[in-house]
């Protein structure tokens, strides 16, 4: 799960999925500095990496509104949705074909490190080094959250629908592999995420199953477009290839693409999630949440994208447009992101959000900060609402051709 829809505030009444030892699914070793997460309304501070860290030191990362979330759902409803005796719309042949795709495990031997990683990390210094550490932290957290959700779904659906359950388990394998690879990347900076602590300590956002489908489909597809775009750019501009993890993105992104295809098949099996006016409204809502989250996040990290030779806003708009076009094949309605006004609204959101962050950094009293934030929050909310209310693009269909596994480049 390469990208997260994080604008929805997490709620704590839902406990985390019960996994006895999630760390065993993630290859790696102990490192000099272990990073933990803590909840906070303030933006995440830069993370410093140093070889002088004392063994066993715990380093906290602040959790903000846009931090990748961990998700849980109504597993009993999931079991009913995929009960073949209840749901006659399930295309078992399609799921069998998908299962064979996942069993093939095209990337089984892909994520193998070499000495380039440590050498490249040692060359990264100053602000760019800090930015890369944060990139690895956030990416690892997002992938690990996908691992936890998919692993639990695989466990809970085993009796109801063994085929779908096995696919979820194999997707959790992919996510664990990604998270482990990213966490090993942190070892190049003498850091590591405490994934066991994350499992127990993080708050979980509850989504109903249909919302899980919308959010995770978008997360996987936007992750595909982010990875393949960065890979293509660096292949054409090798002088910006400052860390070897990007060389793995071509194959890596196909995991994201296959995961998205699976969620597309899940939604096709539940036409009630796609064929009414409520589905159109929710589709637009989740598209907007994912796009806005990415845009606001990335605009706070322009140094990272500039460091690899990309214009942040141009990169984001390319990813948003391509993701939207892909999503239009399945969602009944999508946003008109190719309307120039949509980008103008995103840019105005960035201005308001940056001012909100700046207020948080001041030494003003809390009530003064609150007063200063009110007009900015109002402005940000009005821009988000205005973007949502823009005339949508009617799209999607539940009349699909038979599934044919393919690679998209």
From Swiss-Prot:
The keyword Lipoprotein does not apply. GO terms for cellular component: chloroplast; chloroplast envelope; chloroplast inner membrane; chloroplast thylakoid; chloroplast thylakoid membrane. Residues 1-23, 36-60 are annotated as: Disordered. It catalyses: Mg-protoporphyrin IX 13-monomethyl ester + 3 NADPH + 3 O2 + 2 H(+) = 3,8-divinyl protochlorophyllide a + 3 NADP(+) + 5 H2O. Knock-down mutant (chl27-t) grows slowly with a pale green appearance. Also confers severe defects in chloroplast development, including the unstacking of thylakoid membranes. This is Magnesium-protoporphyrin IX monomethyl ester [oxidative] cyclase, chloroplastic. Its EC number is 1.14.13.81. Keywords: Chlorophyll biosynthesis, Chloroplast, Iron, Membrane, Metal-binding, NADP, Oxidoreductase, Photosynthesis, Plastid, Plastid inner membrane, Thylakoid, Transit peptide. It is found in: Plastid, Chloroplast inner membrane; Plastid, Chloroplast thylakoid membrane. Residues 13-23 have a biased composition (Polar residues).
């Amino acid at each position: 799960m390469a990208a997260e829809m994080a604008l929805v505030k997490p709620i704590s009444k839902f406990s985390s999925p019960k996994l006895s030892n999630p760390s065993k699914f993630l290859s790696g070793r102990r490192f000099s500095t272990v990073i933990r997460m803590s909840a906070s309304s303030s933006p995440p501070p830069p993370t410093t990496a140093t070889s002088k860290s004392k063994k066993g030191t715990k380093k906290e990362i602040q959790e903000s509104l846009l931090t990748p979330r961990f998700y849980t759902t109504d597993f009993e409803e999931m079991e009913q949705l995929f009960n073949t005796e209840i749901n006659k719309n399930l295309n078992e042949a399609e799921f069998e074909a998908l299962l064979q795709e996942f069993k093939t495990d095209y990337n089984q031997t892909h994520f193998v490190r070499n000495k380039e990683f440590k050498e490249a990390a040692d060359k990264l210094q100053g602000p760019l080094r800090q930015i890369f550490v944060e990139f690895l932290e956030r990416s690892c957290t997002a992938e690990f959250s996908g691992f936890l959700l998919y692993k639990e779904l695989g466990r809970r659906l085993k009796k109801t629908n063994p085929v779908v359950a096995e696919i979820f388990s194999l997707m959790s394998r992919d996510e664990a592999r990604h998270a482990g690879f990213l966490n090993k990347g942190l070892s190049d900076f003498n850091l590591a995420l405490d994934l066991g602590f994350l499992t127990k300590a993080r708050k979980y956002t509850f989504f109903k199953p249909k919302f899980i489908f919308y959010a995770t489909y978008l997360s996987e597809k936007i992750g595909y477009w982010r990875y393949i775009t960065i890979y293509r750019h660096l292949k054409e501009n090798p002088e910006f290839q400052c860390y070897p993890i990007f060389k793995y993105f071509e194959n890596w992104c196909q995991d994201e693409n296959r995961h998205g295809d699976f969620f597309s098949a899940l939604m096709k099996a539940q036409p009630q999630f796609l064929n009414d006016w409520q589905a159109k409204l929710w589709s637009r809502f989740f598209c907007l949440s994912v796009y806005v989250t990415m845009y606001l996040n990335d605009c706070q990290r322009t140094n990272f994208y500039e460091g690899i030779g990309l214009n942040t806003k141009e990169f984001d708009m390319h990813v948003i447009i391509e993701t939207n076009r892909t999503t239009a094949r399945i969602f009944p309605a999508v946003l008109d992101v190719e309307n120039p006004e949509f980008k103008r609204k995103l840019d105005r959101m960035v201005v308001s959000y940056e001012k909100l962050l700046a207020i948080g950094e001041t030494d003003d009293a809390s009530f003064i900060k609150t007063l200063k934030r009110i007009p900015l929050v109002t402005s940000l909310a009005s821009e988000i609402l205005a973007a949502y209310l823009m005339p949508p693009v009617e799209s999607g269909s539940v009349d699909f051709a038979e599934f044919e596994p393919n690679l998209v480049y």
